[in-house]
Amino acid sequence: MPKFSILFCLLFGAGIANAQKVAFTEYDLKNGLHVILHKDNSAPVVAVSVMYHVGSKNEQPERTGFAHFFEHLLFEGSENIKRGEFMKIVSSNGGRNNANTTQDRTYYFEEFPSNQLETGIWLESERMMHPVINEIGVKTQNEVVKEEKRMRVDNQPYGNFLGEVMKRLFTKHPYNWVPIGSMEHLDAATLSEFIAFNKKFYTPNNAVLSIAGDIDLEKTKKLMYKYTLVLNTS
């Protein structure tokens, strides 16, 4: 075997061994929410994230772009977080946040100093439990998504390339369209359709909550029960 191949195998094996050393705790809450906890006290920071098992593959062919649209819409606020305040709460507590969508899932996260762990858990419980979905939020985020498409697709060289490839690769499969979807479909959708999509997919039993960083496992579990056991699965 060439020396290069031997070296590659050794390095690859070492990488696998290191990956296996990551310890975590996982369990399910009674409402179906899957929880993953990883303790790493090397720095005073925590990451709180929720992954929903919903992406563009879960959309109807005449209503594409819904999952990506909800990536934006669920930052609009909740019954306990005023419109436009979500990101202000994050930044004012020393954190940052973002979200992204693929064909298979939608992912939200916050990173905070570890003394703001409860803030992160509360924010995600509000997003899941009490989202406010109304006409003004839908209209606002519709314009945001249109601008994103203009910037990243319409006004980029070969911006439509991936979409054209997917159409040809997956002619009879929901991978046929890219997550950003059709602006015409979003324009035609009614408020009731958006509300129904939210109730169907953005629920505890369709989500994974992961928390990693400078945490105390028992205290974190208590916070999980405080903010998530009251959630409904319907």
Features from the language model and the residues they span:
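Short beta-strand micro-motifs enriched in acidic
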Residues: H38-D40, N100
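Envelope-exposed proteins and targeting segments
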Residues: A23-T25, N31-L33, P44-V50, D104-T106, ...
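Bacterial Sec-dependent N-terminal signal peptides
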Residues: M1-K21
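Charge-rich, well-structured scaffold segments of protease-associated domains
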Residues: D28, E85-S234
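Preference for bulky hydrophobic residues occupying beta-strand positions
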Residues: Y27, V35-L37, V48-Y52, E110, ...
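Active/ligand-binding-proximal structured segments within catalytic/core domains
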Residues: G32, N41-I89
